[in-house]
Amino acid sequence: VPCQNSACHGDLRCGQQGGIPMSEMPAYIQDILDLIEWANGDARKTKWGKVRAESGHPKPFNLKYIGIGNEDLITDIFEERFTMIFNAIKEKYPEIIVVGTVGPFNEGTDYVEGWKLADKLGIPMVDEHYYQSPGWFLHNQDFYDKYDRSKKTKVYLGEYATHIPGRKANMETALTEALYLTPFQASCK
């Protein structure tokens, strides 16, 4: 899944609280649309499909998903720019599943606001990330059992890890991650 910047961070000019200037958003959105055309476009009929073919890959990649944002703070700036990108992708490529973000943690304001935005826009999937202690993983094996299955938005758990002080990995962290993942099979309905 290619993950594109939400136009709110990762840009050296503005930091996570800033955003690409609104005057630059149309060009930025076009770059994302061009990426999708490059991945999926017909090599005989599209500009970017032709570039892909000339670069040695004549067949489309059949891209189905694209991530927009990664651990963003869910601010008004984020919401405005994400919504512009999301709507442009849905308009031009309705078959593409946009994977949104619900902030850098699995709790707190950004998580709550990220889910509100997902519900409001009907984002098909969000990428949750979390890094927790072994105790958290042991005591939250039912985390996704509580997930409301009637929601349109599904969860993609793109990043997770058990951390102990110093962020070292050892047998304890490996086993708690394995124990945490065991009930996922039942939760993935």
Model-derived regions, located:
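Catalytic-core region of carbohydrate-active enzymes that cleave or remodel glycosidic bonds
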Residues: 88-90, 94, 115-118, 124-189
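Short, conserved active-site loop motifs that form the nucleotide-linked donor/cofactor pocket
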Residues: 64, 123-124
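Substrate-binding cleft and catalytic face of glycoside hydrolase catalytic domains
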Residues: 1-118, 131, 135
